[in-house]
Amino acid sequence: MPTIGVAVAIPEPWATELQDYRTSVGDATALMIPTHITLVPPTVIEDGTLEAVEEHLAEAAEAVSPFTVHLRGTGTFRPVSPVVFVTLVRGISSCEVLADAVRKGPLEVELTFPFHPHVTIAHHLPDAQLDQAFADLADFECEFDVGEFHLYVHDAEHGWRPTRQFALRPAD
């Protein structure tokens, strides 16, 4: 049974900058996970249902207009979860609308935590490294337009790989 995820990819040059930082702070998973904003967390789907998932995602993409994301500064989920992330200061509600659209039908999943759009920069590391990540990227800032999202499939050898892109409907 395949494991899939759905996410907004962070564009270059910021994707590589944030992934390289994540690697430098000691997060061994960084090279297996493209820099992203999660919409659907890792989800195991039944064999033979990928086509239905793709059809659903295409319909969801038609229901949401492109939007702008502005990333600035850092945040954390500690003490609940050992995660440090770059925060969204613009595009939060649009990410919520998009996540709601994709997490229906075959991708209706119960979330472990409430949805909070973010870009992870350090995960499951000792507190000193999480503190370092929080401080080092406190001044990080970028802005980009979101016109699509991606379906990712997990491969045990190569990690998460985008397999299909879904364009958001053009703004009226």
Feature names for model-found ranges:
Residues 1-68, 76, 91-148, 161-172:
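Basic, often amphipathic N-terminal segments
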Residues 147-157:
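Short beta-strand segments and strand-loop junctions that repeat across beta-rich extracellular domains
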Residues 79-80, 156:
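Short strand-connecting beta-turns/loops that link adjacent beta-strands
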Residues 81-89:
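Charge-rich, low-complexity N-terminal segments
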